[in-house]
Amino acid sequence: MPNLLEKTRKITSILQRSVDSLDAELPYNAMASRLADIIDCNACIINGGGTLLGYAMKYKTNNDRVEEFFEAKQFPDSYVKAASRVYDTEANLPVENELTIFPIESKNTYPDGLTTIAPIYGGGMRLGSLIIWRNDKKFLDEDLILVEISSTVVGIQLLNLQTENLEETIRKQTAVNMAINTLSYSEMKAVAAILGELDGNEGRLTASVIADRIGITRSVIVNALRKLESAGIIESRSLGMKGTYLKVINEGIFDKLKEF
């Protein structure tokens, strides 16, 4: 049976994972699953707004309402507000407590259900909450030590993810600005007309038709598309007589065109 040191090492090894390996839809499912296995419980991670970032159900609660929260990836506002008032780990909360993960209709089914909630901090900010629960087994001091370590590890990963997202946003904005600065007025006009033809972020267009409609030459459109593609703003593929297939991969171009 793993001792406390071995369990701690398993938790801290999570930090060795790259942010790029996180799933976009539920980025912390794997992390919640590992914590659930190590601490022997169910676990979920929510951000400050109550959005579910990841969860692991090692032991089924047999409650449709709780599972609906997970499917919707959003916790009720009342629970989120109550959780935000937890500044230190609250352990072994009974089913009567407002912070229990067990809804009122399951109190008779799981009368001994216990919930532990730990705040997640990072960079001096409250980033979310780590919630773990068991149907009938108390969390001991060793478990709570692991919870404290886990919340710190999750906080570091959340900060890493936020930093990565911010850097990616800045990179995309910079790419758009640089691309726009290379366009002439006519090319900018062409880009606005082209993207206006798309169905969402992608679609088929015919350059000659657009050129005739806005009163520019086809070569202006071709040059504009080439500049955007070289900047990583769009992807294009010739469809021969049917025109050109276009896909926008940097959506920041749409915001920039609103200023045009």
UniProtKB/Swiss-Prot annotation:
InterPro entries: ArsR-like_HTH, CodY, GAF-like_dom_sf, GTP_trans_reg_CodY_C, Transc_reg_CodY_N, WH-like_DNA-bd_sf, WH_DNA-bd_sf. The keyword Cytoplasm applies. Keywords: Cytoplasm, DNA-binding, Repressor, Transcription, Transcription regulation. Residues 1-159 are annotated as: GAF domain. One of its GO terms (cellular component) is cytoplasm. It holds the Pfam family CodY. One of its GO terms (biological process) is negative regulation of DNA-templated transcription. It comes from the Bacteria. GO terms for molecular function: DNA binding; DNA-binding transcription factor activity; GTP binding. Residues 207-226 bind DNA. It is found in: Cytoplasm. Belongs to the CodY family. DNA-binding global transcriptional regulator which is involved in the adaptive response to starvation and acts by directly or indirectly controlling the expression of numerous genes in response to nutrient availability. During rapid exponential growth, CodY is highly active and represses genes whose products allow adaptation to nutrient depletion. HAMAP family: HTH_type_CodY (MF_00621). This is Global transcriptional regulator CodY. It comes from Streptococcus uberis (strain ATCC BAA-854 / 0140J). The gene is codY.
